């Protein structure tokens, strides 16, 4: 307890630090994408992209249907050409917690002949699976922003 620590070590806990720092937090990230198809073929490709994320965030049933497995996780990266982007933040492994779709982002209902929408807006919400610690920055050069 606090009194014991004060007597044995001469140290006092700073109550302001406790108020400020309640523990490590998991970071959340949100990304919005406008996906516009110029043809029905591109529209089908967009549908596959949307399904990839919606299905990837869904829990997986075990073969016996008695248990659920965790959904897929995602490794996010910003790229500058083919290289990692040093001026933007890095991410730890993330879970996709939300996938919101807007089917009429411009306020107009427009489809191709097969019914596929001409434009979608997808907003993805990710949360890192572990907090960022001071020591995590050791893996980056001084010229990188890190996490």
Language model feature labels by segment:
Residues 1-147:
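Acidic, Ser/Thr- and Gly-enriched intrinsically disordered low-complexity segments
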């Amino acid at each position: 307890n606090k009194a014991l620590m004060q007597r044995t070590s001469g140290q006092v806990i700073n109550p302001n630090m406790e108020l400020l720092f309640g523990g490590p937090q998991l970071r959340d990230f949100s990304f919005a994408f406008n996906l516009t198809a110029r043809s029905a073929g591109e529209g089908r490709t967009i549908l596959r992209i949307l399904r990839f994320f919606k299905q990837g965030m869904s829990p997986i049933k075990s073969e016996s249907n008695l248990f659920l497995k965790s959904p897929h996780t995602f490794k996010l990266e910003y790229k500058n050409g083919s290289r990692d982007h040093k001026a933007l933040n890095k991410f730890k492994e993330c879970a996709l917690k939300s996938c919101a779709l807007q089917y009429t982002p411009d306020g107009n209902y427009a489809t191709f002949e097969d019914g596929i929408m001409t434009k979608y807006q997808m907003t993805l919400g990710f949360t890192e699976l572990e907090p960022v610690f001071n020591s995590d920055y050791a893996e980056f050069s001084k010229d990188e922003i890190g996490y």
